[in-house]
Amino acid sequence: MENSMNNRGHGHNQEHADNLPESKRQKLPALASVIVEAVKVDSLQRLCSSLEPLFRRIVSEEVERAISRLENSKSTSRSTEPNKIQGLDGRNLQLRFRTRMPPHLFTGGKVEGEQGSAIHVVLIDANTGNVIQTGEESMTKLNIVVLDGDFNDEDDKDWTREHFESFEVKEREGKRPILTGDRHVIIKEGVGTLGKLTFTDNSSWIRSRKFRLGVKPATGFHIREAKTEPFAVKDHRGELYKKHYPPVLHDEVWRLDKIAKDGALHKKLLKSNIVTVEDFLQILMKDPQKLRSLLGSGMSNRMWDNTVEHAKTCVLGGKLYAYYTDQTHQTAVVFNHIYEFQGLIANGHFLSSESLNHDQKISADTLVKTAYENWHKVVEYGGKLLNCLPVAKKGIKSLPEPKMAQNHQTQQKALQCQQTVNGYSSDPQHLIEYPFVQQPCYQLRDYTSMESSSVSGSYNGGLEDIFTEEIRARSSEMLETDNMQRLLKTFGISGGFGNRDESIYGFSDQYEAQIDKGYMREGGRGAGKAVVGWLKLKAALRWGIFIRKKAAERRPQIVEID
């Protein structure tokens, strides 16, 4: 009977379930969703189990660090040591590093400062900033230690010795001491230099991944310790791939920042025949857009800026290149070792790129573009120093016209002549070497004639248009000054400077007679005559430089550029 009642009840329940609407029936989960849910739970459990040791270690380190700092602060408050470390006479003594550290060092290599410099430490009085050169403290022995890169207290902030030592890094278990070599330094007269030191372990195993060097007194003097900037120490195997700061021109291009050796960017550059830093800089100056397009999207704009900035710190050589705009080689565009525009040479004058005015810059831009397009015509500059050429400040208004080529040829032939003035040759090569005699030979020939107050008629006739009233007035003012009159009177220089009208220069017959008498009185002394000769030559050269400058200013310099 009981079974029949159960069967009847079960049938009733089944009938009731069949009568329920579809939305109210209990849905069973699909097999796929069950599997996905199980995989998610398993993955989450694995992730938690892998992260748990990491979290425990970080929390443990931070708790230990906080406890140690709390204990140090308590001991400091209880101690009688003052906030500022005082010397025997009340001075605030501090150690300071005078050398900056490079961003990277390598194990097994010598510990050096930036660009291979020695590392210096000094003892100063923080109240005055002066180096302590006297007293017992100025001959202190110091211990060199390795600090954690997290020691970020400012140099002007006071800390205790215990606080400083809490950041010292000890070697790992089973490893050699982190720093080997001369771990002590003795300062003499307040200055000391670190000896040979070597790191035996890298800095990747500590949280900051960087070390600092620190120094502290080995004796009982109250001197505050010093620390360097943080730096990374890498395994010596990475030294083969390290970057150079600054790079040199013959370095391979992967020595630049953001370009990895044998990486995608390096391969692109090699494919375009850009092998060295010099090649990189030259194409950067000639066509930066082409270089940027070559590197493509694999180098972001920020990476590009870093690479270019690093490349431009390269130390350049003294090689110069010139693109001559005419056959007479009187006008040229000058480039440096990496094809960067430096300035213009026009009519024997050098105009640096910074000194060009607006119109000259427009003309120069056109010439630079032409030079880059015809780079096969660019030649190495002939070894003459640009700083030996006269610098045109305002006399040259633009580049000379090509129509003036014939005049340049005539002037060049005049420059090729050889004259000797008191034993000094006037060859153009010598004129480049000595800027104060950068005059053409026909002018030097005129200088020698000043002693006898005679000038050839062809010279005066050829330059009649140059010696204008402005130059005559200016020369008269120069010669009429008290200093010039006294100089001429003292050394007996004749008043005829290439013009038969003596009144132009303010000389009178009476004054000439005085000069002649003074000169005759000193004529018997050989040394006096030698001095007079040199002073006459010096005055003549100065006069010629003034005349040539005025002549250059008066010469037309108009040019039309398409």
Curated annotation (Swiss-Prot):
Query: One Pfam family, short name please?
Result: Calmodulin_bind
Q: Where is this region: DNA-binding?
A: 154-273
Superkingdom of origin organism? Eukaryota
InterPro entries registered for this protein in UniProt: Calmod_bind_C (IPR046829), Calmod_bind_M (IPR046830), Calmodulin_bind_N (IPR046831), CBP60 (IPR012416)
Alphabetical UniProt keywords: Activator, Calmodulin-binding, DNA-binding, Nucleus, Transcription, Transcription regulation
Give the main location: nucleus
What GO annotations for molecular function exist for this entry? calmodulin binding; DNA binding
Quote a single Gene Ontology cellular component term: nucleus
KW Transport (keyword) present: no
Per the record, where are the segments of Basic and acidic residues compositional bias? 12-22
PANTHER family attached here?
CALMODULIN-BINDING PROTEIN 60 F, OS02G0177800 PROTEIN
**Member of which family?**
Belongs to the plant ACBP60 protein family.
Q: What protein name applies here?
A: Calmodulin-binding protein 60 F
- Species assigned in the record: Arabidopsis thaliana
Identify the taxonomic lineage of the organism of origin: Eukaryota, Viridiplantae, Streptophyta, Embryophyta, Tracheophyta
